Amino acid sequence: MSMKSIEEWASTIADQSGKIILITGANTGLGFEDARFLAGKGTHIIMACRDLDKANSAKKTILDEHPGGVLDVLQLNLADFASIDEFSARVLDTYSQLDVLINNAAAIMTPYQKTTQSFELGFGVNHLGHFRLTALLLPLLLKTSNARVVNVSSSAHKFGKIDFENLNSEKKYKPMKAYGQSKLANLLFTYELQRRVSTAGKQLLVVASHPGWAKTHPPRSRLQGWMSKLMIQSAAMGALSTILAAVGNNIEGGKYYGPGGFMEVRGFPKEVQSSKMARDIDLATKLWTASEKLTGISYDSILST
């Protein structure tokens, strides 16, 4: 089916009333567009955000467009395990279901920084933070019928490599290399979690998405401005891949969704292929073991109950 507008594509997504969807980083960029779209489909949104002022401002913007929307703002700092633990406990105590967890928030090619637990910020937030969060919310997801986990990756994963000797980028830090590593980790986590969930006989779809080249912030240079006019799509378009993965029909676990246009840069979403490295089961197992050790989390104990 050839699409001409976001509105036309949106008409293919059914009403989602009765569902509760949690989105990390829902106050800006792709996460905001996810929340805005899904609120319009009747979804109860949990906006998990670090900055409450920005989150409440984003909530107001969405409610201005969708006055009947239900959006809860909860504070979550993915760079701090204590915040993740406190947030997760609050979610488990407050909600009786969780239909979709969208792990969207990301630290993108920042100057070198560390999380509270001294992990490189990108790897700590983009991978380890979401790895711990997902584990803590897994009991609620598993008791919710037809639940899904969506990990937002990036085409940058194709340039990534998991450097187990330098996961924290302490020996040498290159922002793009570190970002690619974290986005590759997102995909390895996606596929391995789906394998483990399936092996345990649990009903949960774990999928990944990427936005293509989406405009999530103003151009930072003349070159970026020129490129954005030529190739970069809007954040609203970029968010459609995640929305399809989260609530679309005929979605399969362990799949990857992104723009269907030239080189997956832009376009309406479809199933796409990740890199060969992202599909490396041995690499995924090794990263899983390292991630459990670094986060102090055991998925086996959760999946065995």
Give, region by region, the residue ranges found by the protein language model:
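Rossmann-fold NAD(P)H-dependent dehydrogenase/reductase core
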Residues: 2-220, 294-305
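Polar helix-capping/helix-linker motif
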Residues: 80, 166, 229, 247-248, ...
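SDR active-site lid
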Residues: 196-275
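Residue-level signal for the nucleotide or nucleotide-sugar donor/cofactor binding architecture
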Residues: 50, 79, 232-233, 240, ...
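Alpha-helix initiation/capping motif
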Residues: 175, 179, 231, 276-280
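C-terminal tail/cap regions
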Residues: 2-4, 9-11, 247, 251-305
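Short, amphipathic alpha-helical "lid/cap" segments that border enzyme active or binding sites
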Residues: 85-88, 235-246, 281-288
